[in-house]
Amino acid sequence: MAHAYRDDFPLLKSQDVAYLDNAATAQRPQCVLDAVTEFYKSQNANPLRGLYPLSIAATEAYENAREAVRSFLNAKSSREIIFTRNTTESINLVAYSYGLSHVKAGDEVLVSIMEHHSNLLPWQMVCRQAGASLKFMECEMDGTLDLNKVEALITPKTKIVACTHVSNVLGRVNPIRELAALAHRAGAVLVVDGAQSTPHIPVDVQALDADFFAFSGHKVYGPMGIGVLYGREELLNAMPPFLTGGEMIESVTRDGAVFAELPHKFEAGTVNAADAAGLHAAIDYVKSIGFTAMHQQEVALTRRAMDAIGEMPHVHVLGSEKPEEHCGIITFTVDGVHPHDISEILASDGVAIRAGHHCAQPLLAYLKHPSTARASLAFYNTESEVDRLLDSISTLRERMGYGK
């Protein structure tokens, strides 16, 4: 299946590398590059501001991208789709605009131990400024959240529950709909980091019942520099702007301003229309392949890797023993070999992986691993690339002087 799409990705054709760092950023298909280039070639004007044809065309491209995202997430309205720079900015928008307005002294914010720092540090900030408490949902060693334990942590003081949809370390898909029900029963809102789920599984924010959902374009085969925040319209309407300035106003006087309606209230300044057009192309590309086909390829490759690693006594995979529960993420350690050495040796073999704490230090501390190596697969990866990874891993200890 992967070979049918390899030619769509210029970098994969031009570089002799087994690119297995897709959880950090994905490669871009030619159609995405073309969409960004075409915007600058034929539609380059400031959107939303001019009444001349170029500006109108730029506005249409930008708003068409918003509608594509709405459909991709199955949001009720395009007014619920806010363009940002990335997942980090999206979550910070919620923290500063909703969190600081609703979390008071003595309140509680509940986050999972699996969070990327982008869905942790903003809530640390909110709790610190508000005088609230930050509590953690801890997981089992395979990444499973025990909903009974979670329910016991949620109290009438809980105002926000924040959870990643898919862990960027363990690949575990979290029970978002069930978490939403528990949060809403207590009167809290649920904030979901969808950076790792959107490239791998269908997302329906209405079915998930999420109040806020954030993701980045660059992880779902789109450009860097464009991100998305979905928020329930009634919540967004009641929130103050995150940034102020041009375009996000209806009128300004010496004494104040009347802010624009959704979604533009949260999109101050010149917007990133070119990368929005690229994200639109990426979404169309993903839809043309389908998540079912992508998932089948990723699971097959994950199984191939995990089956082989299971025969290597000094190599240990974190998380579930089931390949289908990893979303293509294989985080591992090798006895006696530092993850940075693993990454450097694999790089010398033409295999690109990630090493470190993966911006999830509390999780790795909880799992008692200060650092790990991570290979993350996409549908365009091949069996030969996985075998290249496995060949390198199998010789690591010998090359480090430990013998076989």
Which functions belong to the PLM regions below?
Residues 1-404:
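Pyridoxal 5′-phosphate
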